[in-house]
Amino acid sequence: MEIINPIPVELNLNELQEKLHMKPGKQWAQVLQLVESAAPLIEAKVVYKTCYIEEKYTDGVQLDGIRLTSPVLGKKLAESVRVFPYVLTIGPKLEEEEKNFTEYIQQYCLDIIGNVALITARRSFEEQLKKKYKLEKMARLGPGSLKAWPIHEQKPLFSIIGDVESAIGVTLNESFLMIPRKSISGIYFPTEIPFEACQLCPREDCPSRRAPFDARQAAEYEPKDTDH
């Protein structure tokens, strides 16, 4: 288990402005004030583990004696040897600050600020992985991001990494959602072929979409009809 704490986070104001669909003006000036007050509350950190795949199956892999079940993992990691399960968070303080505001627009802006901070921290972590392990290209998958890797798979993923709560303060609730809310988890893996989980997700109105839906590729992971 390795911990990076803190992960430096410098918010990209252009990205934030785009996600808020705002133009320069009075309202944007108010957002900049929120950014200034929010910045000290962002405490980005990550815990991860370097794992070598012990067993490979059509519907998953085994890491450190623990099986992860997902046909997407089974296929995407078929040629992989080493992978990096991780949990990353920006901590609870920004989320707690959001509750102190009564106006919806302020709460919404702080929520988006948190999202941008989380994405920024994740990108920074990815670059650190590439540099440390001399990797050119990487892709990632996370439990709950696709039907083919359901959210209850968070539990074995956390078990593989170790004591995530002691390391960075992230826990799972009974629905396998992470606390603090602004946290992400998954597996990074080296790849020669660019891949985004978005390619397998049909949701059309997702504001976080990074790649177009690939219906043909997604069909490969649909449950097969076994009736005769």
Residues covered by each model-derived region:
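Short terminal or interdomain "cap/linker" segment that borders an active site or interface and mediates
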Residues: 136-210, 219-228
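Short conserved micro-motifs at the rims of enzyme active sites and ligand-binding pockets
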Residues: 98, 210-217
